[in-house]
Amino acid sequence: MEFSEWYSDILEKAEIYDVRYPIKGCGVYLPYGFKIRRYTFEIIRNLLDESGHDEALFPMLIPEDLLAKEAEHIKGFEDEVYWVTHGGKTQLDVKLALRPTSETPIYYMMKLWVKVHTDLPIKIYQIVNTFRYETKHTRPLIRLREIMTFKEAHTAHSTKEEAENQVKEAISIYKKFFDTLGIPYLISKRPEWDKFPGAEYTMAFDTIFPDGRTMQIATVHNLGQNFSKTFEIIFETPTGDKDYAYQTCYGISDRVIASIIAIHGDEKGLILPPIVAPIQVVIVPLIFKGKEDIVMEKAKEIYEKLKGKFRVHIDDRDIRPGRKFNDWEIKGVPLRIEVGPKDIENKKITLFRRDTMEKFQVDETQLMEVVEKTLNNIMENIKNRAWEKFENFITILEDINPDEIKNILSEKRGVILVPFKEEIYNEELEEKVEATILGETEYKGNKYIAIAKTY
């Protein structure tokens, strides 16, 4: 089965996301998928909160004149904006955009908040939905018209150096975030022609999906004073002079969820990192005639023992055990506990690891310790496995050879790294190799141009 077919299939079978909503590029997070989303974005919330960011919430509607204020910025996506033109039957005097991203409304407000250098820095974020009229082929959680989960952070500083340090902090936060999820990444500085509209420069995180295409999963932008000059975010310096704030912004989206699914999954279904699994341990009672009460009693006893520390579920559905096993393997539950009469008699408990598909037994007395240790080991294993696959997708060439690059990207895909040379680093190179230049990157101590087929 090809990756794209597998991906669509698993979203449905694992009950993550339903695409059957009657608007192209819009879908529904089902309860199981929503929980994965919630636990995933809890991680980034905590990382941002711990580093001095404050969560806020800005309106979804943006007046046309406000959106158009930063001309270079809006030029980057003006064809993708959804417009509200009527209130009821009355045509509006000023069209309202459904938020494609929030620089313009946030910076309008920052102008009102910032007066002196002591008002800085400002470090805020919001997790909201955004809208883009995607004309390309939409894909669930990858290319959407309603991006249901967009975490955008926006900062303002009194010096250029502080803004540079904020970019470094943002990169560090994202590295911790993706490391926690076991998602491998390549960090690159996007080319001038592909940077965020209105930014001084853009840093991006890309991962590689099983089909060898790269997926942009995070971006960090140094905005310099470009937006603050447009929006007049002016402050009084310690010496009494006036200056414009230095700004940064950085974001992630539902693509993180798509990456968890794509990178860790296998032909049987999901393999969820325990930290975001809605159910970390599923208990499956193996019911035998005449032993029903004993088995269910033991299953409940195990549940009570584990529920304080782990997300646990007893599957007491009246269906065959094999069907239950299959269902939980599709849903990627990291650890399964099987409870049968023989195990109870021998004071043993049977466990099954989703990542390795291995069964093993432990003494009842060791259960808590073994469950915790095994879940940690599962996380480490899937992370190492993901990085190994990622590394295998990287090809390093000693020089630019467009035909060789085209052949590799046609057969193997992945990322091709060629030594960085200023004279060849241009849009012409993209045309020659018929692929995307991700940007400048450092890999194992050397500077390269990264080239790939992208989503």
Swiss-Prot record:
Keywords: Aminoacyl-tRNA synthetase, ATP-binding, Cytoplasm, Ligase, Nucleotide-binding, Protein biosynthesis
Activity regulation annotation text: Inhibited by high concentrations of prolinamide.
EC category: ligase
GO biological process entries: prolyl-tRNA aminoacylation
Family the UniProt entry places it in: Belongs to the class-II aminoacyl-tRNA synthetase family. ProS type 3 subfamily.
Assembly and interaction partners: Homodimer. The dimer is functionally asymmetric: only one of the two active sites at a time is able to form prolyl-adenylate, and only one tRNA molecule binds per dimer.
The record's note on its domains: Consists of three domains: the N-terminal catalytic domain, the anticodon-binding domain and the C-terminal extension.
Protein name: Proline--tRNA ligase
Organism placement in taxonomy: Archaea, Methanobacteriati, Methanobacteriota, Methanomada group, Methanococci
